[in-house]
Amino acid sequence: MRAQGIRPAMLIVDTVFSSDGVWPDPAGFLADAAAAIRAEGGLFLADEVQPGFGRLGTSMWGFQRHGVVPDMVSLGKPMGNGYPVAGLVIRPEVIAAFGAQSRYFNTFGGNAVAAAVALAVLDVIRDEGLMENAARTGAVFRDSLAGLA
């Protein structure tokens, strides 16, 4: 890209490549990619729509497996457990720069019902031990598949 005079703006990555059949990549490999995009002046967005909210069983967010803190995190599907809600979490310095350079308005932002649903989902994840259940269930599934190999 540099040879063509193209400056990258952002690296957007599903932190576990969950659309590829949830094939576990080596933990930590995204750290170098995040460092590379930042060295070029770009931002790193961790797409947590699929792996987020404890679905991996080891941490609340897939990016935690890589030892990185993203500039932005996209959230979705499990956030509302079927209710339409999504979110974008942005580092304070990134949103401050955006706000200084752009005017922004969102027609559907700040929906109180959607926010209440998302908070209730967080309570259920914590109170019912869903992350721990994902770890147990995932281990049984992996072990069962290994037995077929």
What are these regions (language model features)?
Residues 1-149:
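Conserved N-terminal phosphate-binding loop of PLP-dependent enzymes in the Aspartate aminotransferase
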